Amino acid sequence: MAKTSMIVKQKREQKFKVREYTRCERCGRPHSVIRKFKLCRICFRELAYKGHIPGVKKASW
């Protein structure tokens, strides 16, 4: 879980656009965030397996 201060700091308007970065909406993780779902890979995988993300299923071929 990310520190609350870091989550609040990230949500503020940045002086320069380059400083903006994505964070997971669920846990606050800054790395490996899937932009379309606003979730990190760990949360995405967890929710996909549980069937909470519509239209997403495990691939098999």
UniProtKB/Swiss-Prot annotation:
UniProt KW Lyase keyword: no
SUPFAM superfamilies from the UniProt entry: Glucocorticoid receptor-like (DNA-binding domain) (SSF57716)
Binding site for Zn(2+): C24, C27, C40, C43
GO cellular component terms attached to this protein's record: small ribosomal subunit
Alphabetical list of InterPro entries matching this protein: Ribosomal_uS14 (IPR001209), Ribosomal_uS14_bact (IPR023053), Ribosomal_uS14_CS (IPR018271), Ribosomal_uS14_sf (IPR043140)
Single biological process term from Gene Ontology: translation
Entry annotated with the keyword RNA-binding: yes
Record GO terms (molecular function): rRNA binding; structural constituent of ribosome; zinc ion binding
Gene3D superfamilies associated with the record: 30s Ribosomal Protein S14, Chain N
Any one Pfam family match given in the protein's UniProt record, by short name: Ribosomal_S14
Cofactor: Zn(2+)
Keyword list, A-Z: Metal-binding, Ribonucleoprotein, Ribosomal protein, RNA-binding, rRNA-binding, Zinc
CC cofactor note: Binds 1 zinc ion per subunit.
Recorded superkingdom: Bacteria
Family named by the database record: Belongs to the universal ribosomal protein uS14 family. Zinc-binding uS14 subfamily.
Quaternary structure, from the entry: Part of the 30S ribosomal subunit. Contacts proteins S3 and S10.
Annotated HAMAP family: Ribosomal_uS14_2_B (MF_01364_B)
Purpose: Binds 16S rRNA, required for the assembly of 30S particles and may also be responsible for determining the conformation of the 16S rRNA at the A site.
Protein name as it appears in the record: Small ribosomal subunit protein uS14C
Protein's organism: Bacillus licheniformis (strain ATCC 14580 / DSM 13 / JCM 2505 / CCUG 7422 / NBRC 12200 / NCIMB 9375 / NCTC 10341 / NRRL NRS-1264 / Gibson 46)
Organism placement in taxonomy: Bacteria, Bacillati, Bacillota, Bacilli, Bacillales
